[in-house]
């Protein structure tokens, strides 16, 4: 699975930017199958905070649903940070 970096800015494939605040455990997961959740904050508007399953945050863009999108991943680290 892709590495998501706390403190980095990521660009969503639809163009908005978000800062990863933390990666936490999902309270609904149990035992050896603890799921991770990414907490991230919008870098626009009211800077709202959001939570998304780690695997969804790190997932590929659905190229069948969004054939016009050139970005490979749903969220990609903004190169300005690198």
Task: Mark where each language-model region is.
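Mixed-charge, low-complexity intrinsically disordered regions
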Residues: 1-82
């Amino acid at each position: 699975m892709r590495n998501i970096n706390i403190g980095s800015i990521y660009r969503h494939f639809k163009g908005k930017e978000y800062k990863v605040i933390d990666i936490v455990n999902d309270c609904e997961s149990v035992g050896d199958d603890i799921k991770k959740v990414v907490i991230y904050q919008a870098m626009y508007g009211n800077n709202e905070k959001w939570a998304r399953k780690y695997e969804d945050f790190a997932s590929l863009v659905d190229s069948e649903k969004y054939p016009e999108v050139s970005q490979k991943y749903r969220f990609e680290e903004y190169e300005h940070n690198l």
